[in-house]
Design a protein with these regions (language model features):
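Mixed-charge, Lys/Arg-rich low-complexity intrinsically disordered regions
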Residues: 1-11, 75-77
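Intrinsic disorder/low-complexity segments
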Residues: 4, 16, 22, 35, ...
Length: 78
């Protein structure tokens, strides 16, 4: 995923562990070709920095309404 495409609140799939996460920070400089992105895993209190190439955006219909989708967070999730 390109760093320019990453927006706060975007739902993404992490390639290394196939978990769904939410972008909670702007991409930060790491190397000229890679940026670090702060994410929060869904249904978890865990935050991590991931390299932007390890993230894939979920389809638009699985995004929050602010990003053009229809996803609604379940009541019993964190």
């Amino acid at each position: 995923m390109l760093a320019n495409d990453i927006k706060i609140g975007l739902r993404v799939r992490v390639a290394t562990n196939d978990m769904t996460a939410l972008v909670v920070g702007k991409p930060e400089y790491y190397t000229p070709k890679a940026k670090l992105v702060r994410i929060k895993y869904e249904n978890s209190t865990r935050f991590e920095y991931m390299i932007n190439h390890q993230l894939d955006a979920l389809p638009v219909d699985e995004q929050y309404p602010a990003h053009g989708g229809t996803y609604v967070r379940p009541e019993n999730s964190l």
